[in-house]
Every structure is written in structure tokens, then in C-alpha cells.
Amino acid sequence: ERLNGDIDQMTSMIESVLQYTQSEMKFEQLRQISLQSLIGAIVSDFQDANQPVKFVEQDSLAVSAKTILFNSKPKLFYSKILSAQNVIIYARPLSMQRAITNLIDNALKYGRKANVSLQAESQKASIIIDDYGDSETVENLKQLTAPFKRGKNVKNIKGTGIGLAIVSTIAEQHGGNLTFDRWEEGMRVILSIPR
């Protein structure tokens, strides 16, 4: 009975945190922000704390777009934007900062170090965080976006099981999504936001 009471209390607490996050986002105004600048500032804060985080910056980014100019079949073409600083989105800056910070923090906790990069397409921008962990599967990570879910690799790592739920909520509130993949040395988390 005591265990059920504790679980109910924790569930209530997490629902309150998620409601707070959602209501906070309603009051924070959408603004035009440079993802390059935001990511650079966040990564710099981690580096100032001697954390192994690297922003894999690109001088220019490939941008893909579809066009149907006087043609019955859409064609895919690629063009380069002049500077990665041109990756602008309309977003709630504090919420985006919270989401990116949480993803980097998770990469450090469970994957030893983090590489952050930015990809842009005509309709969306993707913030990619690669870690060097190896014990979670993509399917397990997808399940971790539910509140109070923690992975099998947590061992003695402190956490509440709400971080990815909050990031997922922030992504959805911006019309975006959170996806997971593997890369040759670990896990990849992709936060995609419409442009």
C-alpha cells in the first residue's frame, strides 16, 4: 500500500512538472532565434564546466528543397546557404535551451561525451546529439519519452525519468519531434523543429 502511495505521489509530481512546462511554454513568446548561436552558447557553457561536449560546426550547410516550377514532376535540388548562422527558427528560446541542455546532459551521463551538430532543410532544422554509449536500443529510447521511464543502463546514475518526456513535450509544442538512431560509436538523438 505504501509503495502504491509513493507511486501515485511520484506520478502526480511528474504530471505537475509536465503541466508546468506546458503552461510555461504558453507564456513564453515565440521569437526568431539563430540555432547556431543558441547551440554555440549552450555547448560553451558545458565546455566551461570541463565537460566533453563538442559543437561540430559547419561553415555552410546543405539545404534541400523541393521545387515544381513549370514541371509536372517534383525534383529535389540542393543548394548551400552561405552560413550556418542563417539557420533561423521561430521558437521559445528558454524552452529550446532546456531541451538541448537536457539532451546534452543525457549524452554525457549515458554516453561519456557528446557531439552536437546542426542540419537544415527548407522546412525543418535538426539538432543532432551523438553520444558514445552502447547499452540502449532505439526502441528502448523511444519508450523513455514517457514520464518515469528510465533505461536499463542507469545503474548508479541519478535521474528522475522525466527529462526525455519534457524534451518530447517541448518538441511537440513547437510542431517538431524527437527521434533516436544509432551511429557507429553510440546513440544519436535528433530534435527536429519546423523552420
Model-derived regions, located:
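Conserved DHp (HisKA) dimerization/phosphotransfer helix of two-component histidine kinases, i.e.
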Residues: R2-K75
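Conserved micro-motifs of the catalytic ATP-binding
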Residues: E24-Q29, A84, I88-A91
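A residue-level detector for a conserved hydrophobic packing site
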Residues: M96-Q97
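Short alpha-helical Gxxx[C/S/T] motif in the catalytic ATP-binding
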Residues: L103, G163, V167
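Short beta-strand/loop element within the Bergerat-fold HATPase_c
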Residues: K113-Q123
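Short conserved segment of the HATPase_c
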Residues: E136-F148
